[in-house]
Amino acid sequence: MGKSDYPVRELVAKIERGELQLPEMQRKYVWTSTKVRDLLDSLYREYPSGVILAWQPAATVETRAFAVATNSEPVTAPLLLLDGQQRLTSLSAVLRGEPVTVKNRKRPVEILFNLDHPDELTFITEVAEDNESHEDADDADDVDSDLITRVNRRAFVVASNQVAALPNWVKVTDVFKKSDSELLKAAGVTGFDDPNYERYSARLKQLRSIADYSYRVDILEPSKSYEEVTEIFVRVNSLGAKLRSSDLALAQITAKWNGSLALFNAYQAEVAKRGFDLDLGVHLKVLIALITGQSRFLTVASLTQQALEAGWKRTKRAMDFAVNFAQQNVGVDSPTLLSSPFLMIATAYWGAQMDYKISDKDAAAFRKWFLLANAKGRYSRGSTETLLDQDLAALRSEGRIGGLNQRLVQQVGRLDFTAADLVGRTARSGAFKTLFLAFRADGAKDWATNLLISPKLAGHADKIEFHHVFPKAYMKKARPDIDGRDVDDIANLAFISSKTNKDISDKAPADYAPKYSKEQLAKQLVVFDDTNALPEGFEKFVIQRRELIAARLNEFLAIAESR
């Protein structure tokens, strides 16, 4: 194995020129801007930043695109990047000022640097959650004086308009594209005799030195086969738990079936256009389930290319059925209305087991199970793969859904809802997603535009959001004694458009409610009287509405068979 040292600027240039590429086995770019912020902070402090692993293949292999723009001209004998994609893509985006492509959307990676940071920098290490969202949060979304004080203790933050407007903060990308004189002038430095001139200049020099940081690059020799390199890739990434099991499975599949990634991505995009933008891992789980009868990726290494190719044909048919059934039979026209995408796996498997010959009775029974499993969070309570495999086994051995209902009852106890069951349920719960379905069935509309609520409304202004009936900002002022979790309770949430939500802002219910139709408010069980619209009536309102919600959920789920 060869070893070389490359400065960041040269690695970034290699990506831009196409001399450093990604093999098909690699996953997509997944870093959030906060991770990029932390990488820059580490390099600025001259902390070690790991090793880069690459491979010099002897023959041409399938590749996938970087998330940043690269030279489209063919390159002879490029290096293939095995470990370090997230770091180098991030650095390429920041140093070159290029956006990254995430979920088919381009977004800039904007990090701000504090010219006036304290000499003793604040540590910003954070614990990442396993289910961390790909959406970025600004370091100062809601800026107040205390927050600005905390932010000013840092050297780097994710960009926000409020912080960017402060003279001591500059875009990191600008530091690599503009001269000191431009940056210092914008920061209010008037000349060489300015007390901040030397300090700010030294910090700009230190920040630019990130481009000179040297990574050790270990290069696997050309004699290694694609299969062996894939095994190395899986082992390297498994040790640090950097990749999800679906990412590792994808690497093993593409090693056996070259060119399969393009087929997977094309079908994933096709399904997304139909309204179901599902993670590729969901499609791969259906593939494995149809071949092996269970959903875990542990068996991928033993599957042949022939089995994978035949299984993929069955997978596309099964997923087509699952999407059609969810949209047309259940009324779930977006994955945002699912408590777990695993419901689509169970549906696809059921359709295949039935050979797509389904009676009215079976369709109604499965629809009811689907709605109940979604509402009760069948696959969102932990041990999800175990529960899914139990359901696949039930469908395989019994052919009908009696086993599914039995296992659901064993898990949750009761299939109905009481008001007590809803205490503490939030917008992430299956009950809340089911409530949307129930309200839509009742003809609920946006309170201002009179458009039917739907996850598919076009345009940002009409996009449906969940709204706090007693707005959070209002409650902070009017009832600071109320815990924020109580304000986020399902009994205080409704569905309105983004524009209507912004218009209401932090107004009291007693002030904004008279502007809207009582009938439309009532369609979402928002019923005010002389007392419960006042701040002191918050508890009364949520208790009353929680009872109404429980009754409506039970009614909606009970009539599922007759749809």
State the predicted function of each range:
Residues 19-26, 205-222, 227-231, 267-270, ...:
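Short amphipathic alpha-helical segments and their helix-coil junctions
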Residues 375-466, 474:
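Intrinsically disordered, low-complexity N-proximal targeting/linker segments that flank membranes
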Residues 249, 272-420:
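A cross-family structural signal marking well-folded subdomains
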